[in-house]
Amino acid sequence: MNPVIKTFQFGQSTVTLETGRIARQATGAVLVTVDNDVTVLVTVVGAKQADPGKGFFPLSVHYQEKTYAAGKIPGGFFKREGRPSEKETLTSRLIDRPIRPLFPEGFMNEVQVVCTVVSTSKKTDPDIAAMIGTSAALAISGIPFEGPIGAARVAFHESTGYLLNPTYEQLAASSLDMVVAGTSDAVLMVESEAQELTEDQMLGAVLFAHDEFQAVIQAVKELAAEAGKPTWDWKPAVANTELFNAIRAEFGEAVSQGYTITVKADRYARLGELRDQAVAKFSGEEGQPSASEVKEIFGEIEYRTVRENIVNGKPRIDGRDNKTVRPLNIEVGVLPKTHGSALFTRGETQALVVATLGTARDAQLLDTLEGEKKDPFMLHYNFPPFSVGECGRMGGAGRREIGHGRLARRSVQAMLPAADVFPYTIRVVSEITESNGSSSMASVCGASLALMDAGVPMKAPVAGIAMGLVKEGDKFAVLTDILGDEDHLGDMDFKVAGTAKGVTALQMDIKINGITEEIMEIALGQALEARLNILGQMNQVIGQSRTELSANAPTMIAMKIDTDKIRDVIGKGGATIRAICEETKASIDIEDDGSIKIFGETKEAADAAKQRILGITAEAEIGKIYVGKVERIVDFGAFVNILPGKDGLVHISMLSDARVEKVTDILKEGQEVEVLVLDVDNRGRIKLSIKDVAAAKASGV
């Protein structure tokens, strides 16, 4: 087929969608070009048949940045791209979240989306281009999909308002970085970080993005009309209404009673018993439904039971009303040898969070398409299987853990001190020790507490809360502090983090259409109320950062020297600075402008290194008395070392008021003597005197 090209204006950018020239064996393939700078190839492949026995929709999204796109060659021994970076993993999740709910219920055919960045200008993030390309590739593929979607990034400035699809430079000066995706009539996904913006400003950004990306949706529809393949002839399995009614009649009341058990483990055990009874009664014999079909229908009964109870105003699973936060238990300083620690427990969700301070050398080195950069703040989230009472795989962080860690990082990052105020590298680790809903928001609260416990001068404490939604027809209920079951059975996962002043992070995933502005306003309002409640309880335990760092944390001393002294401190081949580090056990970082940061495991080590540097960089002061060591004796006098690397000459006539025949009559090499600096000439030569020391002392020098 001949290539089909569609070009449209998206804010200040010109976007081109092209299909039919590259990757023609994929089910759908689109080449997206933005401003002739960023080019992303997006392919979609769908299996024609479902894999029998899979009880989930096997959708996978892979976003990959090729180094050649930025004119670079990969590092490492093999000189080729390796495992996905954290940025690639996060972008893959960003694309997955808005498209997953748009595949029809019951569709189990495997679908794989691959987004490859093949060219970039290093000015803007290619993620929005990848999201647009995914929407277009799905729209033309013929795979059942209730799209297309649009996507946009929004920045915000107090003076200029909202800005569509900003550059990296514009984002750096912005108080908001938000990505929004959705259909023509609904927002499906929001991912953002902000600097204490109000709820109204955040909601305004969501609505602004939704209005702006309508241009994307229209262009994709036009491309699909011209180049789209016929929609697959797929029909969902016919629901077994008779079996559903039979199981509900037999077990509906028991399931309803099971969901009044407030302890998660006991509730799961009881519902598991009922599920096994249903399988035993309604399957197993010839002519009866399969066990998997019975389990699926039993799950549907659970789903409807919980949702009906909530929208009809009945108490939630654990007995709370819609606005109540679970009981909190907050501790700080729980680990004796760490730099800062906190144990944050909310109901059956618990996070042990630890903050560690390091030197500038501990910063993470990131090799990105834009170039190498150092990241002095890390927040890592771990979710071991024991946190939900299960056995499971132990190993490296998965996509979910990386995503939750990034959300927690976004939440607290805006409240960290500037590098010139607090030049430590900071690593926060959140160990989820119990989980029943919203462990990422527990990590936010725990991170804020641990950082303050470590003495990091936070601008303000931060707390987070997860909101949920159940909507049936015109009835809906917004839930504060959702449980794991409410997250699974609800229609929205809406996480808000911030300070008492404003929002620092907002993440939203919506599974249905019809989420109105009113519902989002209610959710933001309830989240604010809950956040202030949690902050109040956190402040009772630790209201502000400790004034001193932990005794276990490294001591940091900042100082500045003249730039022409840098080479003296470093020494030939780095010999001088290496010697200082080895002898004092401190680490030293020197910048080109003469700024020096000294990190010592103890205060004594840092002070010793500072004194060594001061000694090297100090200049001899005329009229000042020094205690020096005789380094060399010559016929006409003696050379005395008064500062590291600085020797002065005591002429034989300056040794004593009496006549001196031989220098060795008064001095010997290695002897310590007091000397007075008489003069320093324009070549840096120092003239010293021993005989004038007494008079100088008498005059008060």
UniProtKB/Swiss-Prot annotation:
Q: Which InterPro entries match?
A: ExoRNase_PH_dom1, ExoRNase_PH_dom2, ExoRNase_PH_dom2_sf, KH_dom, KH_dom_type_1, KH_dom_type_1_sf, NA-bd_OB-fold, PNPase
The principal location of this protein is: cytoplasm
Q: Which GO terms describe its molecular function?
A: 3'-5'-RNA exonuclease activity; magnesium ion binding; polyribonucleotide nucleotidyltransferase activity; RNA binding
Gene3D superfamilies registered for this protein in UniProt: GHMP Kinase, N-terminal domain (3.30.230.70), K Homology domain, type 1 (3.30.1370.10), Nucleic acid-binding proteins (2.40.50.140)
Essential cofactor(s): Mg(2+)
Localization: Cytoplasm
Q: What is this protein called?
A: Polyribonucleotide nucleotidyltransferase
Alphabetical GO CC annotations of the entry are:
cytosol
Residues of the S1 motif domain: 623-691
Reaction catalysed? RNA(n+1) + phosphate = RNA(n) + a ribonucleoside 5'-diphosphate
According to the record, the signal peptide region is: none
Any GO BP annotation: RNA processing
**Quaternary structure?**
Component of the RNA degradosome, which is a multiprotein complex involved in RNA processing and mRNA degradation.
Q: Which CDD domains match?
A: KH-I_PNPase (cd02393), RNase_PH_PNPase_1 (cd11363), RNase_PH_PNPase_2 (cd11364), S1_PNPase (cd04472)
Task: State the function annotated in the UniProt record.
Answer: Involved in mRNA degradation. Catalyzes the phosphorolysis of single-stranded polyribonucleotides processively in the 3'- to 5'-direction.
From which organism does this entry originate? Pseudomonas putida
Q: Which Pfam families match?
A: KH_1, PNPase, RNase_PH, RNase_PH_C, S1
Q: Which residues bind Mg(2+)?
A: D487, D493
Question: In the Enzyme Commission scheme, what number(s) does this protein have?
Answer: 2.7.7.8
Locate the KH domain: which residues?
554-613
What keywords are annotated for this sequence in UniProt?
Answer: Cytoplasm, Magnesium, Metal-binding, Nucleotidyltransferase, RNA-binding, Transferase
Per the similarity annotation, which family is this? Belongs to the polyribonucleotide nucleotidyltransferase family.
